[in-house]
Amino acid sequence: MIKLRLKRFGKKREVSYRIVATNSTSRRDGLPLEELGFYNPRTNETRLDVPAIVRRLQQGAQPTETVRSILRKAQIFEQLKA
Protein backbone atom coordinates (compact mmCIF):
# COMPACT_ATOMS: atom_id res chain seq x y z
CA MET A 1 0.00 0.00 0.00
CA ILE A 2 1.24 3.48 -0.88
CA LYS A 3 1.08 6.11 1.87
CA LEU A 4 1.52 9.86 1.80
CA ARG A 5 3.56 10.70 4.88
CA LEU A 6 6.03 13.21 6.31
CA LYS A 7 9.77 12.60 5.98
CA ARG A 8 11.83 14.44 8.60
CA PHE A 9 14.63 16.80 7.55
CA GLY A 10 16.74 19.46 9.23
CA LYS A 11 18.78 19.84 12.38
CA LYS A 12 17.79 19.26 15.98
CA ARG A 13 15.11 21.73 17.06
CA GLU A 14 14.96 23.10 13.48
CA VAL A 15 12.87 20.40 11.92
CA SER A 16 11.17 20.58 8.55
CA TYR A 17 9.39 17.85 6.64
CA ARG A 18 8.98 16.68 3.07
CA ILE A 19 5.67 15.19 2.01
CA VAL A 20 6.47 11.95 0.20
CA ALA A 21 4.74 8.97 -1.36
CA THR A 22 6.27 5.80 0.04
CA ASN A 23 5.54 2.15 0.61
CA SER A 24 3.73 1.62 3.92
CA THR A 25 6.31 -0.92 5.10
CA SER A 26 9.36 1.30 4.51
CA ARG A 27 11.09 3.39 7.19
CA ARG A 28 9.98 6.95 7.91
CA ASP A 29 13.17 8.43 6.48
CA GLY A 30 13.73 5.72 3.87
CA LEU A 31 13.88 6.14 0.11
CA PRO A 32 10.55 7.55 -1.12
CA LEU A 33 8.79 6.70 -4.37
CA GLU A 34 8.18 10.41 -5.03
CA GLU A 35 8.55 13.74 -3.23
CA LEU A 36 5.30 15.70 -3.32
CA GLY A 37 5.88 18.78 -1.20
CA PHE A 38 7.44 20.52 1.76
CA TYR A 39 6.13 21.52 5.20
CA ASN A 40 7.87 23.68 7.82
CA PRO A 41 5.89 23.74 11.10
CA ARG A 42 8.00 26.55 12.60
CA THR A 43 7.11 29.08 9.90
CA ASN A 44 3.91 27.30 8.79
CA GLU A 45 5.26 27.28 5.21
CA THR A 46 3.79 24.69 2.86
CA ARG A 47 4.69 23.97 -0.77
CA LEU A 48 2.74 21.26 -2.59
CA ASP A 49 2.97 19.63 -6.02
CA VAL A 50 -0.81 19.56 -6.46
CA PRO A 51 -1.07 17.58 -9.75
CA ALA A 52 1.23 14.86 -8.40
CA ILE A 53 -0.70 14.64 -5.10
CA VAL A 54 -4.05 14.39 -6.90
CA ARG A 55 -2.62 11.68 -9.18
CA ARG A 56 -1.35 9.65 -6.19
CA LEU A 57 -4.68 9.97 -4.37
CA GLN A 58 -6.55 8.81 -7.50
CA GLN A 59 -4.23 5.80 -7.64
CA GLY A 60 -5.32 4.87 -4.11
CA ALA A 61 -2.58 6.32 -1.88
CA GLN A 62 -3.63 6.76 1.76
CA PRO A 63 -2.50 9.95 3.55
CA THR A 64 -1.56 9.88 7.22
CA GLU A 65 -3.59 12.02 9.64
CA THR A 66 -1.08 14.89 9.61
CA VAL A 67 -0.75 14.91 5.83
CA ARG A 68 -4.54 14.70 5.52
CA SER A 69 -4.92 17.86 7.63
CA ILE A 70 -2.30 19.68 5.51
CA LEU A 71 -4.11 18.65 2.33
CA ARG A 72 -7.45 19.69 3.80
CA LYS A 73 -6.08 23.17 4.57
CA ALA A 74 -4.80 23.43 0.98
CA GLN A 75 -8.22 22.27 -0.33
CA ILE A 76 -6.75 19.36 -2.30
CA PHE A 77 -9.74 17.10 -1.64
CA GLU A 78 -12.08 19.60 -3.34
CA GLN A 79 -9.90 19.40 -6.47
CA LEU A 80 -9.99 15.62 -6.26
CA LYS A 81 -13.80 15.56 -6.29
CA ALA A 82 -14.04 17.96 -9.27
From Swiss-Prot:
GO terms, molecular function: structural constituent of ribosome
Signal peptide: none
Protein name listed in UniProt: Small ribosomal subunit protein bS16
Family: Belongs to the bacterial ribosomal protein bS16 family.
Keywords per UniProt: Ribonucleoprotein, Ribosomal protein
Encoding gene (name): rpsP
A biological process from GO: translation
UniProt cross-references to Gene3D superfamilies, sorted A to Z: 3.30.1320.10
InterPro entries: Ribosomal_bS16, Ribosomal_bS16_CS, Ribosomal_bS16_dom_sf
UniProt keyword Iron-sulfur present: no
Coiled-coil regions listed: none
PROSITE patterns in the cross-refs: RIBOSOMAL_S16 (PS00732)
Gene Ontology cellular-component annotations: cytoplasm; small ribosomal subunit
Pfam families assigned: Ribosomal_S16
Highest taxon listed in the record's lineage: Bacteria
